[in-house]
């Protein structure tokens, strides 16, 4: 699969072009929503704010900073949005799923504005088609590791000096818990329950609180790491994973954790290994070894087993399905003979 093409388009200079009036309108909407759901201020709303900035830069450059509430915008909204879709495709090289999210970001602003009485109608509601096939579009590679590959990583992390104890912990806890990287980045010493081998009340996607469970080996690593931390920051930083910046220890960012995961993937010769691959590997491994899809869904904090089935279980080849059918038939025949 081809590498994802990254474009740095939205520089400080371009963002400075955004109309102050348009910025003021969106900030009012954003603050209103943050008040209702502060838990996702630095996650979901940060993404939406960034996407809206991109749209406002587009308006500044292509539509002379047209006012978001102006009659001209209302009249030309469909043309504006279709042009923005083309811009996202041709200039930013966004995939379909990202483009749909960007459209939803703008649409949500107008839905709020309509409820508040700032406008009389939504300018493009039901007039635009969402990008089709977004869910089927493969954006990044997914790797489902087998036992041999998982063991190779675990053993290499123990012996290769270029990896440290935090690398071991990230790999081990992610594999044990099958949690998202967002939860892993928020692990704290205060939330740690060593006796029950779990981190409690960790805020994850959209502010939901989850548990992050781990096994015996991870427990050993955590104990070792906490002893080391006494000599580093005397456990003053509550975050489990830390980095040193400007002479001070602070919480390790999600981006730094992902960089470490990418480095771990190089053990297997994978240069595009990402945190979600570990999550998928863990959940798929549960299903393969237990045959219980609901158990995998529960571990993944999924509300529906269909989410687990469609996105976290390794698709079987026709040959694998055939072999499975043959084995099932053989078992049925053996059972009949015994009867």
Named regions from a protein language model:
Residues 151-181:
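Basic, Lys/Arg- and aromatic-enriched nucleic-acid-binding interface segment
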Residues 204-224, 237-260:
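C-terminal catalytic core of Y-nucleophile DNA break-rejoin enzymes
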Residues 1-11, 326-339:
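C-terminal secondary-structure termini that scaffold catalytic or DNA-interacting sites
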Residues 192-194, 271-272, 291-311, 334-339:
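Short, polar N-cap/turn motifs at the start of nucleic acid-interacting alpha helices
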């Amino acid at each position: 699969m081809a590498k994802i093409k990254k474009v740095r388009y939205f520089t400080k200079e371009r963002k400075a072009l955004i109309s102050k009036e348009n910025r003021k309108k969106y900030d009012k909407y954003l603050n209103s929503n943050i008040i209702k759901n502060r838990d996702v201020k630095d996650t979901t709303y940060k993404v939406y704010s960034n996407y809206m900035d991109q749209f406002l830069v587009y308006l500044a450059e292509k539509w002379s900073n047209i006012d978001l509430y102006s009659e001209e915008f209302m009249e030309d909204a469909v043309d504006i949005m279709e042009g923005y879709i083309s811009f996202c495709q041709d200039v930013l090289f966004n995939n379909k799923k990202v483009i749909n999210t960007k459209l939803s970001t703008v649409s949500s602003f107008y839905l709020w504005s309509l409820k508040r009485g700032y406008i009389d109608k939504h300018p493009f509601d039901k007039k635009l088609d969402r990008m089709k096939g977004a869910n089927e579009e493969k954006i990044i590679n997914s790797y489902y590791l087998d036992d041999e590959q998982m063991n190779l990583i675990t053993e290499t992390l123990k012996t290769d000096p270029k990896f440290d104890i935090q690398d071991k912990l990230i790999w081990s806890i992610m594999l044990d818990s099958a949690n998202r990287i967002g939860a892993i980045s928020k692990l704290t010493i205060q939330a740690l329950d060593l006796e029950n081998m779990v981190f409690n009340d960790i805020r994850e996607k959209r502010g939901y609180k989850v548990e992050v469970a781990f096994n015996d080996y991870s427990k050993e690593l955590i104990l070792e790491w906490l002893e080391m931390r006494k000599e580093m920051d005397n456990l003053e930083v509550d975050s489990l994973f830390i980095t040193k910046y400007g002479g001070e220890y602070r919480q390790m960012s999600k981006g730094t954790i992902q960089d470490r995961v990418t480095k771990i993937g190089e053990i297997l010769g994978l240069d595009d290994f990402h945190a979600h691959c570990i999550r998928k590997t863990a959940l798929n491994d549960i299903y393969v070894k237990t045959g219980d899809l609901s158990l995998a869904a529960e571990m993944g904090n999924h509300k529906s087993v269909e989410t687990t089935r469609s996105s976290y279980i390794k698709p079987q080849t026709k040959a694998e399905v055939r072999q499975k059918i043959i084995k099932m038939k053989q078992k049925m025949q053996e059972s009949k003979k015994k009867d």
